[in-house]
UniProtKB/Swiss-Prot annotation:
GO terms for cellular component: ribonucleoprotein complex; ribosome. This is Large ribosomal subunit protein uL24. Gene3D superfamilies: 2.30.30.30. GO terms for biological process: translation.
Length: 109
C-alpha cells in the first residue's frame, strides 16, 4: 500500500488560482484533499447549497461554502517576491528537505 501523496502546496499556504471562474484571485489554503488531488481555498470557488433544517443547522436555507479546486489550477505565492511561482525542493546542509521559490530562490519552509 502506498503512503500519502506529497504536493508542492500545503495547508496555510497563500495560493493564486491560475484557471477557472476565480482566475487571478488569491487566498489561503484551508485543507488539501490528497485522495482527490484537490485543495479548499478560503473564500474562493464558492458554491450555494440548499440545506434542510437539522440538528446542526437549525434555520436551514441557502448556504455558501468553498468548493475544492484541483491542485494543478493553483500556484503558490512567494512571500518575498509576492508573485505566483513554481516550487522546487532542495536539501539543506543539515539534511532537511525544504521547498523554495524558483524565481527568487527563497526558502519557503
Amino acid at each position: 500500500m502506498k503512503g500519502q501523496k506529497s504536493y508542492r502546496i500545503k495547508k496555510n499556504d497563500t495560493v493564486m488560482v491560475v484557471t477557472g471562474k476565480d482566475k487571478g484571485k488569491s487566498g489561503k489554503v484551508l485543507r488539501v484533499i490528497y485522495k482527490k488531488d484537490r485543495a479548499i481555498v478560503e473564500k474562493l470557488n464558492m458554491i450555494k447549497r440548499h440545506m434542510k433544517p437539522s440538528q446542526q443547522n437549525r434555520q436551514g436555507g441557502i448556504l455558501e461554502k468553498e468548493s475544492p479546486i484541483h491542485i494543478s489550477n493553483l500556484m503558490l505565492i512567494c512571500a518575498k517576491c509576492t508573485d505566483p511561482t513554481r516550487v522546487g525542493y532542495k536539501v539543506l546542509d543539515d539534511n532537511k528537505k525544504v521547498r523554495f521559490c524558483k524565481k527568487c530562490n527563497e526558502v519557503i519552509d
